[in-house]
Every structure is written in structure tokens, then in C-alpha cells.
């Protein structure tokens, strides 16, 4: 599989895993009778997403040098920030977005190396 396709898939699966972990953490606010089942469901989805992401990551490392692939994984910061705003209503400050922009600029610089 093409490394340009694998990298976004790894990032997306990692982002999904992070969102599921956040959802599992929020399940502790549920009534005690439902808490454990909901938490375990979200954690199971997180483990599957992160596990698939790890397998694709291993495949990606067969195609790209670690020094190129790993910095590009920083795109996860962008995805998780956007998803946190969309799904959880979390606010990001201007300083946070400037940091995200710096990460995106770094990703652009890394892509020129390929």
C-alpha cells in the first residue's frame, strides 16, 4: 500500500482511538449501573483503532525512514484538536492554533523531503 495513503490512515485511526478514550473517561459521569459497560465498550473500540493504527504504522515504517515518517505523525495534533472542538466543544486559544499552524508548516517541510 502507498505510504501517502498509509500515513493519513494511521493518523485517522490514532485520532479515533484518542476520541474513544476521551469518551470512555466521560462515561465515569454515568450512573454506576451503566458506567462499566459503557467504559469497556469505548475502550474496546479505542484498542481496536489504536491496534490497527499500529499495524499500519509498522507497514509504513517498511516504506519510509523513521526520521521522515515520525514527524509527519504530528498531523495527529491537528486532527485531535479539530475533533475535540467538533465533538466535545473544547476551545482552542490563538496560541494553540499558532502551535497547530507551526506543526502543519513542519509537515509541509517534511513532505518536500520525500
From Swiss-Prot:
Limits of the EamA domain: 43-112
Presence of the UniProt keyword Cell membrane in the record: yes
Keyword presence, Transcription regulation: no
Biological or metabolic pathway of the protein: Bacterial outer membrane biogenesis; lipopolysaccharide biosynthesis
Chain segments annotated as transmembrane: 38-58, 64-84, 94-114
GO cellular component: plasma membrane
Localization annotation: Cell inner membrane
Topology of the protein relative to the lipid bilayer: Multi-pass membrane protein
Main location: membrane
GO molecular function: carbohydrate derivative transmembrane transporter activity
InterPro entries: EamA_dom (IPR000620), Flippase_ArnE (IPR022883), Small_drug/metabolite_transptr (IPR000390)
A Pfam short name: EamA
GO BP terms: lipid A biosynthetic process; lipopolysaccharide biosynthetic process
Keyword list, A-Z: Cell inner membrane, Cell membrane, Lipid A biosynthesis, Lipid biosynthesis, Lipid metabolism, Lipopolysaccharide biosynthesis, Membrane, Transmembrane, Transmembrane helix, Transport
Gene3D superfamilies listed in its UniProt record: 1.10.3730.20
Oligomer status and interactors: Heterodimer of ArnE and ArnF.
Assigned protein family: Belongs to the ArnE family.
NCBIfam families: PRK15051.1
Function: Translocates 4-amino-4-deoxy-L-arabinose-phosphoundecaprenol (alpha-L-Ara4N-phosphoundecaprenol) from the cytoplasmic to the periplasmic side of the inner membrane.
UniProt cross-references to HAMAP family, sorted A to Z: Flippase_ArnE
PANTHER family (UniProt xref): 4-AMINO-4-DEOXY-L-ARABINOSE-PHOSPHOUNDECAPRENOL FLIPPASE SUBUNIT ARNE-RELATED, SMR FAMILY PROTON-DEPENDENT DRUG EFFLUX TRANSPORTER SUGE
Name of the protein: Probable 4-amino-4-deoxy-L-arabinose-phosphoundecaprenol flippase subunit ArnE
Natural source organism: Yersinia pseudotuberculosis serotype O:3 (strain YPIII)
